[in-house]
């Protein structure tokens, strides 16, 4: 007499968690961090059409790591939810916390009820409305529906430990856009070098996806930084780094940080 195969609920949850974590770790890394003007998103992404960073609503942005088809479905669902709520009530009723809670409920249901969990990790970020002084909000939503409030920065996908350690050492509150981009790119390089076991690789315009939630924009805060705008920011970052190496006691110059990256939404 044969007995039916039995697996305990605890073991089933462990196996699902392991599957999801491995899938997320195989993806390329994404960094989101607060800076003086709002929130900066930087992702390792050589593709120009398969984007990991997106606008959800007027003051709310989205970034993700993991399986593209899964987080893209979540992204589109979040946009539809935000548009419907903003139309039915008021645009200010759509908040980052609200969208993060919706994603957490969706992922929690998928994790417990479906045969395979989503191999995704999400970031929902929000900046204050124009004229307000509320600090940016960053929410991390994991594959099992857990939600955490991240005060300054967060890392998803790839070699998160080495990137997070680099950010802990170099992150500065209220940094300019140029400085924040330099911090994020240096951390991503540290993670890529750790994964490859070699020197830090070059991350340039062709291999980066960059966007910001700019709190100084009147309505739609999200804008992408692409092409010549991104190239100028990276060039300024490199020149400031070389000047800092030559004159480490020199004063920080951030006057030009707002003049770059004016690209399309």
From Swiss-Prot:
The keyword NADP does not apply. It is found in: Cytoplasm. Gene3D superfamilies: Glutamine Phosphoribosylpyrophosphate, subunit 1, domain 1 (3.60.20.10). Its main location: cytoplasm. The formation of the proteasomal ATPase ARC-20S proteasome complex, likely via the docking of the C-termini of ARC into the intersubunit pockets in the alpha-rings, may trigger opening of the gate for substrate entry. Interconversion between the open-gate and close-gate conformations leads to a dynamic regulation of the 20S proteasome proteolysis activity. GO terms for molecular function: threonine-type endopeptidase activity. SUPFAM superfamilies: N-terminal nucleophile aminohydrolases (Ntn hydrolases). Component of the proteasome core, a large protease complex with broad specificity involved in protein degradation. This is Proteasome subunit alpha. It comes from Mycobacterium leprae (strain TN). The lineage of its organism: Bacteria, Bacillati, Actinomycetota, Actinomycetes, Mycobacteriales.
């Amino acid at each position: 007499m044969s007995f039916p195969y039995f697996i305990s609920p605890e073991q089933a949850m462990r196996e699902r968690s392991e599957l999801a974590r491995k899938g997320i770790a195989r993806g390329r890394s994404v960094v989101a961090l607060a800076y003086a003007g709002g929130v900066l998103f930087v992702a390792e992404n050589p593709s120009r059409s398969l984007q990991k960073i997106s606008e959800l609503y007027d003051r709310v942005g989205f970034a993700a790591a993991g399986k593209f088809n899964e987080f893209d479905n979540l992204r589109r669902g979040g946009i539809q939810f935000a548009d419907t709520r903003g139309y039915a009530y008021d645009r200010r009723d759509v908040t980052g916390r609200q969208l993060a809670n919706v994603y957490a409920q969706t992922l929690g249901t998928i994790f417990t009820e479906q045969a395979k969990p989503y191999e995704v990790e999400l970031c929902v970020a929000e900046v204050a409305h124009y004229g307000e002084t509320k600090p940016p909000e960053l929410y991390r939503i994991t594959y099992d529906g857990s939600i955490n409030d991240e005060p300054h920065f967060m890392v998803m996908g790839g070699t998160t430990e080495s990137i997070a350690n680099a950010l802990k050492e170099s992150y500065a509150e209220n940094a300019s856009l140029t400085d924040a981009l330099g911090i994020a790119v240096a951390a991503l390089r540290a993670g890529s070098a750790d994964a490859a076991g070699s020197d830090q690789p070059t991350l340039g315009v062709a291999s980066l996806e960059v966007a910001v939630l700019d709190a100084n924009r009147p309505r739609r805060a999200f804008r992408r930084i692409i092409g010549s705008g991104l190239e100028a920011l990276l060039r300024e970052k490199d020149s400031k780094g070389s000047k800092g190496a030559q004159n480490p006691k020199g004063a920080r110059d951030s006057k030009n940080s707002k003049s770059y990256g004016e690209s399309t939404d």
